[in-house]
C-alpha cells in the first residue's frame, strides 16, 4: 500500500487545496507581472477565478502594481470575426543586445472577442469602449454599436437591448451617449467638435470623445479616438504631441495645437521597413509603439511576420524630441492578406 502516502502527499500539494487563504493568493498574484497570468490560469480553477476577479485588479492598484498593455485588433481573410490580441512580454525572458533566435514579446490572442470590427477605441481606466461605424449613421439602433472590454477580467461586456444604460439622442447634429454622471461620449467630426473640445484641434479626424463634467464647470477629456490611418502612413497622439510616420518623410512630430512638423531624432537600431510594409503607430503608456510586417520567405511569401518596436520619448527642448529604441521583436505570424484594424493601450 505504498501508493497511499504518495496519494496523500499529492492531495496535500494540490493547487485546489485550501492551504492558503484566497486573500493571500490574491496579494501574491497581484505582485506578479500579468505576463505570467496566462500560464498561471492553467494551474487550477481557483487560480483562473482569482485571475479574472475584480478584487485582483483593485489589489494591484493598492499595491501600485498596475501595468500598461497594448490591445491590437486584426482581421484575417476567410474569418468572419476580427481577432483581438494583447502585447505581452514572455516570462523569464531577458532583453539582450546580442542577436537572439527566440522572440521575447508576442501578441497573445484574447478569447471570446466580439464578432464585429470596432474601428473606434477609447480607453477609460481599465475599460476599452469599442464603437463601430454604426454610431456615425444616427440610426435608432445605434446603441448596438458599443461593446465594452474589461481588461482586468479580460472579458467583453455586450450591452443587451433590455439592459442598456446608454441614452442616445441628437444634439445639434451630433450623437451623444450618457453612460453615467461621470462618463459621457460624443461622436462628431473634428470641425464640429472644435468649439466644445478646443484641445482636440488637429489635422486628424476625431471620431469619438469620452469626457466627464468637472465639479465647478467645464469638462475633463478622459480619452478620444481618432482616424489615425492614412494609407501606408499613420498618426498617434501622446501627451499633446502628434507623431506621424510616412514612407517619404519617416518619423516626425508636431504639437497638437499646431506648428511645424519636426523630425523625430535618434531611433538608432530601428530596422528599415520594407517598401511594401504598412507601418502603424500607437501610444502605450506614454511610449511610442510601432507595428509593421515582413514577408516570411519560408512560407512561399504566403505569410507575413508582424514586428513591433517600443520607443521611449525624451523632450530635450521645445523644438527637439529624441526617440530611443527600447526593444523590437517579431510578435505574430499572420496570413499575407491580413488587415490592421486598430490598437489601444489600457492600464490594468
From Swiss-Prot:
Matches recorded under InterPro entries: F-box-like_dom_sf, F-box/kelch-repeat_ARATH, F-box_dom, Kelch-typ_b-propeller, Kelch_1
Stretches assigned to the F-box domain: 14-60
Record-annotated membrane-spanning stretches: none
Pfam families in UniProt: F-box, Kelch_1, Kelch_FKB95
Stated name of the protein: F-box protein At2g20380
Amino acid at each position: 500500500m505504498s501508493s497511499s502516502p504518495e496519494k496523500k502527499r499529492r492531495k496535500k500539494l494540490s493547487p485546489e487545496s485550501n492551504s492558503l487563504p484566497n486573500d493571500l493568493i490574491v496579494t501574491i498574484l497581484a505582485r506578479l507581472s500579468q505576463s505570467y497570468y496566462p500560464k498561471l490560469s492553467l494551474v487550477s480553477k481557483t487560480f483562473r477565478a482569482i485571475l479574472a476577479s475584480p478584487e485582483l485588479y483593485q489589489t494591484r492598484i493598492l499595491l501600485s502594481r498596475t501595468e500598461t498593455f497594448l490591445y491590437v485588433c486584426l482581421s484575417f481573410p476567410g474569418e468572419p470575426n476580427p481577432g483581438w490580441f494583447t502585447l505581452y512580454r514572455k516570462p523569464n525572458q531577458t532583453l539582450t543586445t546580442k542577436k537572439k533566435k527566440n522572440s521575447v514579446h508576442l501578441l497573445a490572442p484574447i478569447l471570446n472577442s466580439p464578432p464585429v470590427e470596432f474601428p473606434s477605441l477609447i480607453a477609460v481606466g481599465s475599460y476599452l469602449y469599442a464603437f463601430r461605424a454604426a454610431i456615425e449613421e444616427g440610426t435608432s439602433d445605434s446603441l448596438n454599436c458599443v461593446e465594452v472590454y474589461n481588461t482586468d477580467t479580460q472579458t467583453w461586456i455586450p450591452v443587451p437591448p433590455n439592459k442598456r444604460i446608454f441614452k442616445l439622442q441628437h444634439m445639434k447634429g451630433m450623437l451623444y451617449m450618457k453612460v453615467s454622471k461621470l462618463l459621457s461620449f460624443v461622436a462628431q467630426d473634428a470641425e464640429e467638435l472644435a468649439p466644445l473640445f478646443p484641445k482636440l484641434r488637429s489635422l486628424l479626424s476625431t471620431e469619438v470623445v469620452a469626457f466627464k463634467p468637472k465639479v465647478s464647470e467645464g469638462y475633463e477629456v478622459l480619452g478620444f479616438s481618432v482616424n489615425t490611418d492614412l494609407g501606408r502612413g499613420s498618426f498617434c497622439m501622446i501627451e499633446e504631441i502628434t507623431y506621424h510616420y510616412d514612407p517619404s518623410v519617416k518619423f516626425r512630430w508636431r504639437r497638437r495645437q499646431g506648428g511645424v512638423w519636426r523630425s523625430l531624432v535618434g531611433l538608432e537600431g530601428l530596422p528599415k521597413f520594407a517598401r511594401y510594409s504598412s507601418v502603424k503607430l500607437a501610444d502605450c503608456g506614454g511610449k511610442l509603439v510601432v507595428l509593421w510586417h515582413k514577408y516570411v520567405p519560408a512560407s512561399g511569401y504566403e505569410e507575413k511576420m508582424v514586428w513591433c518596436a517600443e520607443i521611449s520619448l525624451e523632450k530635450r527642448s521645445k523644438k527637439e524630441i529624441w526617440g530611443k529604441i527600447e526593444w523590437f521583436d517579431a510578435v505574430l505570424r499572420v496570413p499575407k492578406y491580413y488587415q490592421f484594424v486598430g490598437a489601444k493601450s489600457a492600464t490594468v
